[in-house]
């Protein structure tokens, strides 16, 4: 499974979802790779120190002689590895302009891993540019985090249009796993209303699991840990493990 975590809006829990879904998959004994395609590198520094990152996804994608395997680093969590990002990744789109295979760079690099990882999770940048398209072309599945806030559905049409364009030609096998509602505060009427709106737009694509707003989820990256080791008894850990279970169920349901 190669799952891209994408939403063109920032602040929707995209990186938190990528980090903790990857960790949950690894904890199930599956060798898992987290690929950071966001120049902000928040997924990377959720597990690694800056000074440990010598080469990044920029090098692996932009340089023909650099393999993805050359940049991958282990984390303290067994079975979890990271292909880290650096701020230089922001220059990649300009670097690849005009290259005929620009949309296939990541897909080709992943192919060189020869199935070493059972699961790959890709943290996309909050934009619908070349980096996100590379992730969608490489992925088998797409997961969309959506915060239960007033502007939750803003830009949804653009995202769905991009997904459809990718499915029409470069990656017809791409499947939308679903939409997960994040940072949900069930105490507020607004959050409940937005949740209903998301269900109206996406219907059965919405995961049953809802990620509640939880301070532990915000704190864990500062300690270079996933929520499962930082606060294993927290609501955040329960929610993300439940999401992982649902993801696996949906993937298996479509492959049997």
Where are the regions that the model predicts?
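P-loop NTP-binding core
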Residues: 1-256
């Amino acid at each position: 499974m190669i799952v891209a975590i994408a939403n063109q809006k920032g602040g929707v829990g995209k990186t938190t979802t990528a980090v903790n879904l990857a960790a949950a998959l690894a904890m199930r004994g599956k060798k898992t790779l987290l690929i950071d395609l966001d120049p902000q590198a928040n997924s990377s520094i959720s597990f690694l120190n800056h000074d440990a990152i010598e080469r990044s996804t920029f090098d692996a994608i932009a340089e023909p002689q650099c393999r993805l395997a050359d940049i991958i680093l282990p984390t303290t969590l067994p079975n979890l590895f990271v292909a880290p990002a650096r701020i230089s990744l922001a220059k990649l789109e300009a670097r690849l302009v005009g290259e005929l295979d620009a949309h296939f760079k990541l897909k080709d690099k992943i192919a060189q891993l020869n199935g070493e990882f059972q699961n790959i999770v890709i943290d996309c940048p909050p934009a619908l540019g070349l980096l996100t398209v590379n992730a969608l072309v490489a992925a088998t599945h797409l997961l969309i985090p959506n915060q239960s806030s007033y502007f939750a559905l803003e830009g949804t049409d653009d995202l769905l249009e991009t997904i459809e364009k990718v499915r029409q030609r470069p990656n017809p096998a791409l499947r939308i796993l679903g939409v997960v509602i994040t940072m949900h505060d069930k105490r507020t009427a607004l959050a409940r209303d937005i949740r209903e709106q998301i269900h109206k737009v996406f219907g059965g694509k919405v995961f049953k699991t809802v990620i509640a707003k939880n301070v532990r989820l915000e704190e864990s990256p500062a300690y270079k840990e996933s929520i499962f080791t930082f606060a294993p008894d927290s609501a955040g850990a329960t929610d993300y493990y439940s999401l992982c279970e649902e993801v696996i169920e949906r993937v298996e349901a479509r492959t049997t």
